């Protein structure tokens, strides 16, 4: 089998490339995916409110675990990644957040990445998006990704939590992806007008499937990329449960879109990576690149949970006898509780004036439960998910063998810097001050977690070590740039070889301020134009917020109540 391009991974980036490259009728593309189809009748992946279900099994989840994390009580921590058409867009939380404009301006300040500024990237965000309330300078109206905005009449806790954030002295913003990310406001989601998950399989692949120049093979686990000298020429993969070896060849390029965990593994198994590691595993060296698998970053987060004095939370939706009605309304009408991911409000703040753009993110949820669906509080409640955005901590990914079925060694090195501890302590204390504001007086019950007894630095640190969790945002493990630890250039081309690119979240040089899916799609849209030889989209001239000397907050309406005095 020979194609012009072989794409490894039908995820958030790979599906974008498959759709865009096959717009050229004379180009042939093979798309390889280790998982299976995105079954449209499987509520676990298609119903937004069921987002916890895919993380509880292995049909759609690689279910990686980290090595014992030394600063987190040596816990082996979850590292769920999507498996199947859609990749992690098939199992993520569907929060449509692009990051802060300053993230991209920072990227563009790095040598070789000058065309990755916010105004360079904004046209590609717009190209990918169809927002349900229409386009503007920041949002698109004709893209493959359906974006739904919160509507009047949604849960009153969303509005109360945003109002509390403003009363605590932080800005309000009406669009976390618009002129000003900083502040509290409504949160958009990747959900279709019919209440279905808007994965890239639905948005991009559905457009491309009818084309004769696209071949999709599922249950195809990539073993390694093949080379002739320094040129990538094809892919060796294992097909089906039997693991039958197959080979496909690429006339032009191999495009690696495996994500921040799989892409460095595949490069290392193919002979591209740290020379010492490859020699130890008897992997023939094609190109020594010490940065492959290094610079690994993620977002860590915690939940602060409270009981709710009024019966307005989503707790009844967790009870089995209410779920058939919710499911029927969603299935036939695409409406109701099932049609939302229930992350309809959130925000970004600076915990201290020293930060030039937000370093803390909030997701508000009108129920008290872990992200993966475990440990649901058996009463009406609500919670704030809070975590730092740009930790200085850096991890790494290393293959353990040549076997593509063996999971790699993953170490994020969470909380390995003093800044991490300052930020998370600040985050807990600021959250308590937000929850104490008058807007939440009608709803705020007792603090369930961390609890009134967790107050001083040592107590907060112990809570963080034991309870902080991944936000499922691994990135940066094959970073763009031209320094000695860079893996690819600003167009995703792997240094030192020909005919090979990496296009996914792994090539971010630094993690962004927010959820990764929208930005991963943007990266793929931008590089797709490069691959096709298209003129880049014209740079935007939209104005955007820069904090400058603006204080991180003003005086709160109410200074924090002692935790023990909460009603």
From Swiss-Prot:
InterPro entries reported for this sequence: BetA (IPR011533), FAD/NAD-bd_sf (IPR036188), GMC_OxRdtase (IPR012132), GMC_OxRdtase_N (IPR000172), GMC_OxRtase_C (IPR007867)
Function: Involved in the biosynthesis of the osmoprotectant glycine betaine. Catalyzes the oxidation of choline to betaine aldehyde and betaine aldehyde to glycine betaine at the same rate.
Keywords: FAD, Flavoprotein, NAD, Oxidoreductase
Name recorded for this polypeptide: Oxygen-dependent choline dehydrogenase
PROSITE patterns: GMC_OXRED_1, GMC_OXRED_2
Family of this protein: Belongs to the GMC oxidoreductase family.
EC number: 1.1.99.1, 1.2.1.8
Pfam families: GMC_oxred_C, GMC_oxred_N
Keyword Signal listed: no
Cited PANTHER family: CHOLINE DEHYDROGENASE, MITOCHONDRIAL, GLUCOSE-METHANOL-CHOLINE GMC OXIDOREDUCTASE
Designated gene of the protein: betA
Ranges that cross the membrane: none
Enzyme class, broadest EC rank: oxidoreductase
Pathway: Amine and polyamine biosynthesis; betaine biosynthesis via choline pathway; betaine aldehyde from choline (cytochrome c reductase route): step 1/1
Binding site for FAD: 4-33
MF terms (GO), sorted A to Z: betaine-aldehyde dehydrogenase (NAD+) activity; choline dehydrogenase activity; flavin adenine dinucleotide binding
Any single Gene Ontology cellular-component annotation: membrane
SUPFAM superfamilies attached to this UniProt entry: FAD-linked reductases, C-terminal domain, FAD/NAD(P)-binding domain
Cofactor(s) essential for the protein: FAD
Catalytic activity: choline + A = betaine aldehyde + AH2; betaine aldehyde + NAD(+) + H2O = glycine betaine + NADH + 2 H(+)
GO BP: glycine betaine biosynthetic process from choline
Active site: 473 (proton acceptor)
